[in-house]
Amino acid sequence: MEPKRIREGYLVKKGSVFNTWKPMWVVLLEDGIEFYKKKSDNSPKGMIPLKGSTLTSPCQDFGKRMFVFKITTTKQQDHFFQAAFLEERDAWVRDIKKAIKCIEGGQKFARKSTRRSIRLPETIDLGALYLSMKDTEKGIKELNLEKDKKIFNHCFTGNCVIDWLVSNQSVRNRQEGLMIASSLLNEGYLQPAGDMSKSAVDGTAENPFLDNPDAFYYFPDSGFFCEENSSDDDVILKEEFRGVIIKQGCLLKQGHRRKNWKVRKFILREDPAYLHYYDPAGAEDPLGAIHLRGCVVTSVESNSNGRKSEEENLFEIITADEVHYFLQAATPKERTEWIRAIQMASRTGK
């Protein structure tokens, strides 16, 4: 019997021979991970057995490269994968860990447990806590804060984080809150903004997280930026980058000249509405930007000849300037989600 497919999608993988990062179509099975050069390929480029393997996340071996996790096999071979964003990494890590645990216990992988899970008081689910903190109504309020002639947008103070943890009854006291906030920082759920919080993370303070009104932090993917006399680390972002990120992930994009298809990481922002696309293997600057205000986005079932397209899950964006972009999602559900999100963003802001 074929092993069950648990999860699949695009991840960026580090080459085992050369120090190159390339997007791959990755499939998590009950007993291993297969990776393909393209989603349409029939045979995988490689397979990683999960029995006896260990998983490290977050993996911080590569400096500025975020959302990386590492799988080490029983033969001490390291395999590095990079997700497009934090929640995507966490979803892969959660399923891989569960698959490894199921192999060890001789069990079949199942998403829903038939037994009621008993949550111990001292056990904190950082992923769930992060989502609660980001809740627009009940979560931590993102502010524009000023310090040292700089304006930090979409951020909050260290003491606000501890205040929220205590008032939300996630922790019993501020000392326990400091421990949880440090864990959130170490796992990448919070990012330091400004010299004070960055110095604490770099080890010049006793605790990596500071319960302090002058220590600033932000959520990854929040649209954080710093204005005015900014340092090299706090880049002044253009107007088009100021919108809040509402969706991101990898899609196939057709080139305008050669008409070939390549995997690109897309980040969708609203107000102003822009869809930026990047080389998923690591470039920080976008390859291009699609201004979505007044655009039309539709699913594509047939090509210009009227015949049914051989490519599945296609959709097209036509900008107000009548530039056409053809994109391909991995599944019908993913295509629908992208179309709805782009349509919603195109009606907001500038």
From Swiss-Prot:
Residues 136-221 form the DEP domain. GO terms for cellular component: cytoplasm; cytosol; extracellular region; membrane; plasma membrane; ruffle membrane. SMART domains: DEP, PH. GO terms for molecular function: phosphatidylinositol-3,4-bisphosphate binding; protein homodimerization activity; protein kinase C binding. Keywords: Acetylation, Phosphoprotein, Repeat. The keyword Cytoplasm does not apply. GO terms for biological process: actin cytoskeleton organization; cell projection organization; cortical actin cytoskeleton organization; hematopoietic progenitor cell differentiation; integrin-mediated signaling pathway; intracellular signal transduction; negative regulation of calcium-mediated signaling; negative regulation of G protein-coupled receptor signaling pathway. The modification N6-acetyllysine is found at residue 64. The modification Phosphoserine is found at residues 113, 117. InterPro entries: DEP_dom (IPR000591), PH-like_dom_sf (IPR011993), PH_domain (IPR001849), Pleckstrin (IPR037370), PLEK_DEP (IPR037371), WH-like_DNA-bd_sf (IPR036388), WH_DNA-bd_sf (IPR036390). Pfam families: DEP, PH. Residues 4-101, 244-347 form the PH domain. Major protein kinase C substrate of platelets. This is Pleckstrin. The lineage of its organism: Eukaryota, Metazoa, Chordata, Craniata, Vertebrata. The gene is PLEK.
